[in-house]
Amino acid sequence: SSLTAWNHKNFAPHAKKIVIDIDPAETDKLDMDIAVRVDGDLAAVLPLLAEQEYEMAAELPTWQTYCARMKEKYPAITAEMRAEKDYVDAHVFVDELSRQLTADDVIVPESSGAAGEITYQALRVKRGQKVKNAAGLGSMGFGVPYALGACLANGKRRTILIDGDGAFQLNIQELATIAQHRLPIKMFLWINGGYASIMGT
């Protein structure tokens, strides 16, 4: 619920929702209409889905037109964000970072809060880059160890962590591991008076 917010009924209210979860108790927590519920291991369910025939191709142009309209209506970077102020706007920062990143970079946004959410909104991904999803599912402090693991798992490719100052402190001891293995991890920390997710609950 930390990723979809707490008002489940307003989560994609007009969408047909299909929920696949290995733990039925997790699906039971969702207070929303679920069109198809599958209690099972995704490893077993995905091959079954791959065997099905879908009639999505006819709807694809309509969906692409809708997406283009939404991108125009809700741009990731607005003129107001670009306006000069006494701090760097987070969206503008991610936009500039996107410009400077290379096709070989691995990008790891923090698992919770603005560092993750804004990065996913404003990052322009280049072919060849790897952007790691917030596999911590909102767990604060996930960023530093996740960047460490992502760097090692990708052959020590340059790894970019975008983290909030509060979350960064929770696993700061992993800096010793990063230094010991001389990992090419660059960290951008947002000093944003954070803990917004916690303060909002």
Question: Where are the regions that the model predicts?
Answer:
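Active-site diphosphate/adenylate-binding microenvironment
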Residues: 68-151
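Structural motif corresponding to alpha-helix initiation and N-cap regions
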Residues: 5, 91, 169-172
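A short acidic, amphipathic alpha-helical/loop segment
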Residues: 5-8, 96, 174-177
